[in-house]
Amino acid sequence: MPLQSPLTFSDEQINIGELKQELEKFSSTQKQEFLNHHPVTSLVLARAEYMDLLLTRLWQYFGFNDIYNISLVAVGGYGRGELHPLSDIDILVLSNNKLPTALEAKISEFITLLWDLKLEVGHAVRTVNECAQIGRDDLTVATNLQEARLLCGSEDTFQALKKVVLSDSFWPSETFYRAKIQEQRERHARYHDTTYNLEPDIKSTPGGLRDIHTLSWVARRHFGATSLLEMSRYGFLTDAEYRELVECQDFLWRVRFALHIELRRYDNRLTFAHQAQVAENLGYVGEGNRGVEMMMKEFYRTLRRVAELNKMLLKLFDQAIINGGATENAEILDADFQRRGSLIEARKPALFQARPETILDMFLHIANDSTIEGVSPPTLRQLRTARRRLNKFLHTIPAAREKFLALCRHPNALHKAFSLMHRLGVMAAYLPQWSQIVGQMQFDLFHAYTVDEHSIRLLKHINTFNNPDNHAKHPICCDIYPRMQKKELLIIAAIFHDIGKGRGGDHSVIGEGEAYDFCIEHGLSKPEAKLVGWLVRHHLLMSVTAQRRDIYDPDVITEFAKQVRDEESLEYLVCLTVADICATNPELWNAWKRTLLAELFYSTQRALRRGLENPVDVRERIRHNQQMASALLRKEGFSARQIEVLWQRFKADYFLRHTHTQIAWHCAHLLRMDDPNKPLVLISKKATRGGTEVFVYTKDQPALFATVVAELDRRNFNVHDAQIMTSKDGHVIDTFMVLDQHGEAIDESRHAAVIKHLTHVLEAGRPTKIKTRRTPNKLQHFNVKTKVDFLPTKGKKHTLMEFVALDTPGLLAKVGRTFADLNINLHGAKITTIGERAEDLFILTSEAGGRLSEEQQNELRDKLIEKLSDAVTA
C-alpha cells in the first residue's frame, strides 16, 4: 500500500496512535529500501522531506498559519535537508516579538505532540533579536542558524533572521574560521587525534561526518556556498576533491543509516555490539569476523581520506583566503624544495608527476631538518594528484629504492618521516603490501589499532630506545639499540612484521618471504635478508615463550636458544618484541612483562655464551640457590641444623624454581611458625618480577588451587603465574604472581585483608564457592571457542596443556575445580589474557604422579569444554 503524504492527513488522523502508525510505516519502508540498495542520499533527503510535510501539516492543524509574523524553521542538519532514521530534528519557532502566553502554551502542545510521537526533536522559541544575541555568543547556535531553512510561516520574519545571520557583524568569516578550527581541534583531542578508534563515532571521530560539515560551514560562511557542489564552483575544491568528498560522505551515510535502523535510541558509535549487524546490512559477508573486518577496513580508509582532505583544504583556505595569499619568505633547500616557515614545499608545480622519486627526497628533507613540521597545502595537493596518477609502485623505481633505504638508515626518520609518509599515503604508494593493510582491523579487544597504525606506532616505539630517559622502562632495549650496527634491518622487519595480515594463512610466513625479497631488491646482502625474514617469521616467538612457556625449565631455554641461534638475532628479536607489545595496546606493557622478557633474554644469552652443547647443570643451580639462601637465613639467626631439617621436607624442584631471596623469605617465616600445621600466607611488600608474590603454605586439600584463585578473583586480582608444589610430608608450597586490574603490583594497603581472607578459607579446609559475576558487556559480542591442546613432552614426567577460552569471570577457578574433580595434579600455570581471550598453559600430572594418558586427556578436554560452554551461555 503506497505511503500517504502527511500534507493530506485529515484532522481525524492527527492523533498519536495514527500518526505513530504512519511514521512506523514510513520508517519500515525506508529500511526495506535501504536493504534493497536504494541510494542512501535519496533516503536521507526523502526523510527530511517527509518531516517537512508532517511538520507543515501539524503547523496548519494547530492554526499557526493564521498567526502573522511567526515562522517554523529547520536548523542544523535538518536545515541542510539531511535526516537519518534517528537524527535530531532541530527546529526553531521564530517570531519578530515576544509571543503571548496563550500562543506559547499552544506551541508547547505542538512540541509535546512531536515528543509523544517519539521524534528526536530539539527546539527553541526565539525572536529574531534573541537569535542574533545568542548566536553572537554561542558558536553552536551560530552554526545552526547559518543552515536555517524556512518550513512554513512568515517569509518576512525568516528573511529578517537571514539578514542578521549573513551580516559580517554576526560572525566575521575569519573569526568563524578560527573558532571552527579550535572546535575541531578539541573534538579530535577527545578521540585521541586518531581515526583508528575500536568503536568509532561515525559523526564525530577525526575523518567523520563532522569533518565534512566543518568544511561546509567554513565555505558557507565565507562564500555563501550551500553544498559541496557550490564549494567546487567557488574554487574551494577541485572537481576531483569534490567527487572524493561526495564518495566519502555517501559511504559514511550508508554506515550511519545501517546503524540507525538497528537502534532504538540515537547513537552514532559503531560499537562491537552492532558492528556485525551493520556489516551484514551493508552486504559485507565472510567467514567468522571477515565481514566486519572488511567493512571496518573501508570505514577507516574513508576516515583517512576525509581527514586528509579536511586538513589540506582548511590550510589552503587559511593561506589563500584568510591571509590573502600572504606568505613568509622561502629558504631554498635544493633545486626541488624550499622551506617556508615550518612547512616544506615543492619549487615546481608538477615535480612529483615528472619525477616521482622526489616524493622520497621530500621526506629525507623532513628527517634532516628539525624545523620542518609538515608539508605546505599546495604541495600536499600536488602530492595527492601525483599519488593518484602513479602507474606503478614507487619501489619499482631504482632511485626511489635508494632513497627509501636512506630513510630506513636515517636517525630521525622513525620520529618524523615514516608516520607522515603513512598519513599522506606514501607508504601505500611505495609498497603494494602496505596498501593492503591500510585500515585492516581485527575484531577483538587486544589490538587497539589497525595493522598499519600499529606498525607505525611500532616504529615510533623503536625510536624511544634511543632515549636514555626510557632506560628504566626498557633497560635491555635502551642498552642494545643505540649500539646496534645495522638498525635498518630492525626497521625493515618492523615494517613487514604484520604485513601479511588479512590475506589468509599465516601472516608471519607470508611476511617472511616478502621481507626477504624486499631486502634483496633494495641491495642488502643475503645474510641480512635472511635475518630480516627470520625476524618477521618469528616476531611472536619471544613473547609467546616468555608468557606461555615454563622459562624456568632448562629444556625450554635450550629449545628457544636453538631457534634464536646467536646473540645478534636475540638482540634484534628482543627490541622487535618489546616495541611490538607496546604498539599493540597502550595497556599491555607492565613490569611483569618486562621481567619475564628480561629473564628469558638473559637465560638465553647465558645458554648461547655457554654453548648449546653444554646444557645448564640443574644440580649446580640447586646447590647455588641453597648456599645463597642459607647464608641469608643464618644472618637472621637461624642455625644450619634448623635450615637442614626444614629443607629435608622439600623436593628439589622447589630450589630450582625459586630465587635464593624467595627461598630465604619463605623459610624465615616457616621457621618462625608456632604451629606448623596452620596455614601460612605471605605477600611480598616489594614487587617481585614486576608483580606481587602471594606465598601459600598449608596442608594439602582438595581443589586448593581453585580455592586460592577464587579468593583472589573475589578481590579483583589477576593471577599471571603459579608454582604449585607439595612437600614430602603432604604440605603445599604454592607461589602465585598476582597483579591488580591495572596490571600493577597490589597496593600494600590491601595486603592485610588478602592474608586474612585467604587464611580463613584455607583453615576452613573445603573448596570455596566461586564468585559468580555477569560476563562484562564488552565480552558478550566475541565468540572465542574453548580449545584444549596437549603439547608433546618428550622425556618428561608431566603433561603440558594449552588452553584457550573467552576470559569470563572466575575462569581460572573453574579450570582448577575441574582438575580437582578429575583427580589431576596441577604443578604450574602461566596465565595470559589477550583482549577477550585467555591463553593459558598448565603443567599437569595424573593422580599417580605421571603423564596423563590419552584417555585422561580426552576426558579433561571434554569436561573443560562442557563446563566453560555452560558458563558462557549461562
Curated annotation (Swiss-Prot):
Modes of activity regulation: Uridylyltransferase (UTase) activity is inhibited by glutamine, while glutamine activates uridylyl-removing (UR) activity.
Source organism, top-level taxon: Bacteria
GO molecular function (one): [protein-PII] uridylyltransferase activity
Region listing for Uridylyl-removing, in residue ranges: 333-692
GO BP annotations listed: regulation of nitrogen utilization
Domain HD: start-end pairs: 451-573
Domain ACT as annotated: residue spans: 693-777, 800-874
Cofactor(s) the protein needs: Mg(2+)
Keyword Zinc-finger: no
Family: Belongs to the GlnD family.
NCBIfam families: PRK01759.1 (NF002487), PRK05007.1 (NF003448), UTase_glnD (TIGR01693)
Domain notes: Has four distinct domains: an N-terminal nucleotidyltransferase (NT) domain responsible for UTase activity, a central HD domain that encodes UR activity, and two C-terminal ACT domains that seem to have a role in glutamine sensing.
Protein's UniProt name: Bifunctional uridylyltransferase/uridylyl-removing enzyme
The organism of origin for this protein: Vibrio parahaemolyticus serotype O3:K6 (strain RIMD 2210633)
Gene: glnD
